[in-house]
Regions:
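Acidic/His- and Gly-rich active-site-bordering loop/insert found
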Residues: 2-137
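Active-site rim/loop-helix segments in enzyme catalytic domains that contact anionic ligands
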Residues: 140
């Protein structure tokens, strides 16, 4: 699970920030990180791990986020394969949930590898655009 946490010290943008500009920043961020996201996705897909046994998937996702200096809590909520990554502090919260377990007998035919990297991409896009929109204060 990834969590984006807002700041109590948010300020409104001094100039209007269009949806098109926001989309452009998000798309550029995701496009830039796409090769690394695909590598993580392929690692998870090629190494299916059933529920509560997703050690490699957990390590792959947390290492990726830690490498980008996000605050990551491994083994969050008393679950060995859960994690929380935060951006900002206090205030509003936006939560992106990721699934990365495989199903018995079919591996990742369920697509959970994609349900891991898609919210990760959304989290990274949000973490890039929100400070530029002055919606969040960046703590990296």
């Amino acid at each position: 699970m990834t969590v984006v946490t807002g700041s109590d010290k948010t300020t409104a943008a001094t100039e209007p920030f269009s949806n098109g500009e926001a989309r452009g920043i998000i798309n550029t961020t995701i496009d830039t990180l796409s090769p690394e996201l695909r590598t993580g996705d392929n690692t998870i897909h090629s190494n299916p791990e059933e529920g509560y046994e997703e050690g490699l998937a957990h390590k792959t996702l947390t290492k990726f986020l830690e490498g980008r200096r996000f605050a990551v809590t491994r083994h969050a909520y008393g679950i060995d394969t859960s994690f929380e990554a935060t951006f900002g502090s206090g205030g509003r919260q936006v939560v992106f949930c990721a699934e990365y377990d495989a199903l018995p007998g079919i591996g990742h035919a369920c697509g959970h590898n994609l349900i891991a990297t898609s919210p990760l991409a959304a989290f990274l896009g949000a973490a890039e655009v929100l400070p530029k929109m002055k919606v969040l204060t960046q703590n990296l």
